[in-house]
Structure formats: C-alpha cells, structure tokens
Amino acid sequence: MTNKKTFALLLFWLFFIFAFSYLIPDFSNNYRYMMVEGEDRLIASFYDIVVSQYRHYFTWGGRTPPHVLASSLLYLGKGVTAFATAACYILLVYLIFKISCIEKQVFTKHLNKILFITTMLWICTRNYGEVFFMTVTACNYFFTTTFILFLCTYFAKSFGGNVNTDKQNFSKALIPLFFILGVIAGWCNENTGFAICFASFLAIVYFYFNKKLNAVHMSLFLGFCVGFLILVLSPGNHVRLENMEKGSFDYFEHIFTAIEIFFISLFENSLLLIAMAYLLYLSVKHKILRKYKEQYLQALYLFMVGFASLAIMIFSPNFPARSSTPFTFFSIATVLCLYNIVNKEEIKVMSSVKQKVLYGLALSYFVVTASNAYGALFTIRDDCKQRDVQIQKMISEGQKDLVVEPFRVQTSRYIFIADVRQDPKYFANQILTRYYHLNSIRRSCDYKKSNYPATDFHLIQDYGKKVCESSK
C-alpha cells in the first residue's frame, strides 16, 4: 500500500513539474541563450551552441556546463525541456533521500520522507518559480545542484562506512571518469564550486587520518578544484566584473546588502534549521553522539556543503535569491540524515497527531499557493500571447522602437516574470531588442517597488489587473 501511495505522490510531482515547466512562457535570459553569442540570430544546431558558449566563456561568464545545457534544452523545445525538468525533479528527491541514508533503505517504502522532501522544497526554496521553471536559472542551480548531490553522495556515504572505500572498489579505468565528472561539477557554479572544494577538502583530511582515503575521493576532489579554477579564472567573469565596477557599484555598501540577503535566506529556511536544532537536542539528550560519530559527520558534511555555498555569496558582487538553492537542497538532506540517526535508536521525534497537524498545514499552504500560481500561470500565458501579437503587428508596420503594454502578473515566489521595463537600457529590454532585431523596446510604465523585503515573500498573486498604468 505504501508503495502505491509513494508512486502516486511521485507521479503527481512528475506531472505537476512537467505541466508548469511546459506552460510557463520564456523571459529575458531564455531568449538570450536561444541566440548565438555575439550575433543576433537564433541557434540552429548543436555546433552553434558550442561556438556560442566558447565565445561566452571569453566575453561574459564562465559557467559553460549549465549554459551548454540551457542552450541545448531551449534549442530542443518546450516538450523536451519540461520532461527533463520533471525527470530531474524526481531524481533530486531520490538523491536527497539517498545521500541522507545511514544504512540501506528502499526509496519507495518511505512515503513520509518523500513527502517531507517535496514539502520542504515547496516551502523553503527561494524563488521557486525561477529556480525550477526558468530554463536558464534551472540549469544554473537546479540541474547542477542535483548533479553535485550525486557526486557528493560518495563522500557522504564514506563517513558512515556505507560504501566500500577499498582502493579496488572501482576499476582504475573509471578514475579518469570521476575526475572529469568532478571538473564539470566544479565548473558549474561559483558558490557550489567553492562549497564542494571546501567541504570535500575537510572530508579528505579526515579520511586520510582515518585510513579511508582512496583514489575516487582524490580524483573527485581534484576535479572539483580544477573545474572551479576554470570557472573563476574565465576571461568572461573578469569582463563581467569590470562592467559592474564601471557603474556605481560600491563593494563596501554591497557587503551590508549581501549580509541582509544571507539572513533572509536563513530565515526562509528556518523550518529546516529549527528541525536540525531539535534533532541535535534529542541526540544530546539521549547521549548518542559518540555512538553514531561518523553518521553525524556525514550530516555535518552535507550541512557544510550547503552552508558554504550560501556564506560565500556574501563576498560575491551579485547575490541573487536563487543562489540559496544549494543551501536548501543540502539542508533538507541534513535534516533527514539527523532524523535517520535518531530514528535508528527508536527515539520518538514527534507524536503522530502533531505530525498529521503539520502535514495538514503544509497541504493547506500548498493547495492555496499552488492553485493561485496556476491561475497566475494561465493569465501570464494569455498576456504573452497578446504581447506577441502586439509586437508582430508593430514590426509588420515597420516600427523599430516599440512600446508594449504591461502584464497582469508580477514576479512572486512561485511565478517568475522577467519582463521588459520602461528603461530601454534594462538588460531584459536589450535582450529582446536583439531577439526581434529592433532599435529598442520598452514597457509603457513601471510598477512601484514592492514593500516586501524580497519578491519571494510575495506568496499569493493578485493577478488579473495590469501591474501599472501608463501616465500618458
């Protein structure tokens, strides 16, 4: 019976993620990665993608692996992208479950854990709509962090002795493959690249002194480091930084803003942090820390990867909310790992009544926010269709400087809208100017800045009315 319920839950999320990913319109950066870098033409082959990302590495950024994936998915179309997103979501849930296990467990027999993972992903992931459904962002954070979880599983399991760390565990012929996979992982993203290098270095020191270190650990770690260096030393990253410094960017002032974003991210993951603290309290109370020393180190490793990926962003010149995604994913895994330790000792974590109440509240939250997001989704689809008709009509009339009407939906946690603004120099405007071969494009008006400390505090959309009214 549990298996059937588990399959039903996974099937629901597979369909939910597929539908949302398929129906959401493309915005800003998606259009950019549909085009060949340095040209105003659409990508027409995989060769174009290689050329485009080669140029991109030298002119704007170093995240080649996720950007190759993003351009490939955009080239292959919505159907393939939606299927890949949904499949990766199920893989993410599986990997979080697997990396948190302290002994062998059958995935489909643990409905409550799968329910916990999917619930926490929905509640705690900042800018959920952007992270999972905006193709370029999804490739930068969702797909890459899932891949990194896969590679970190070997490190995490090595603490508890759940993998054979003997040097002959893997064929020597596979060692170069682990190195290559490590390079790709380190090359994916600045914050996760740093985090896996930092946490895995500490793990390797521990394995060395406890005679657990093997060639797989070293090949992965060296791959992480090489990939991270390829990323941070890319000429494109230096160009990007120079462009920021040419403006009014003040690094000292930015640090205070970054610290604020850091604490907002901690606050939005506070349910997970509270759960960690409570499970550690139970561990101390029942005096099981020594007994499960290595399993607690496994949990610590998971937390260190997530926390390091978030903390390093304080020193980055750009700290978007989406960059907290790895922290959320690894924090969920940390909580489950701690729970598995406590549960192995048959320590009661929570009464069944309290558990049902919490899941009831979570279900209510999901129903309200998800149904509202779907309503907003169909509204923005209709708006984009009307916008496209409006643009094509003006282009057919020979216009090169376009003014478009505003949408009836704003960006929120579960719906991501990266619309053009009134300023034609805004980055989204410039992307569409290239895409449509125009002189300029702008929106007729801008809406007032939200009172929320961040857009993802906006949980419920008041959609249906234009986000702003033209002053003319």
Language-model features and meaning:
Residues 2-60, 74-92, 101-111, 358-472:
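Intrinsically disordered, polar/acidic, low-complexity terminal segments
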Residues 5-7, 105-116, 170-174, 213-221, ...:
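Membrane-interfacial loop-to-transmembrane alpha-helix junctions, especially the N-terminal start
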Residues 19-83, 135, 185-300, 314-323:
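Transmembrane catalytic cores of multi-pass membrane glycosyltransferases
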Residues 89-100, 147-159, 198-205, 275-283, ...:
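Transmembrane alpha-helical segments
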Residues 110-159, 189, 267-272, 307-338:
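Membrane-interface micro-motifs in multi-pass membrane enzymes
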Residues 118-126, 182-186, 223-234, 304-314, ...:
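Aromatic-anchored segments of alpha-helical transmembrane domains
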Residues 157-183, 218:
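Short hydrophobic alpha-helices at membrane interfaces in multi-pass membrane enzymes
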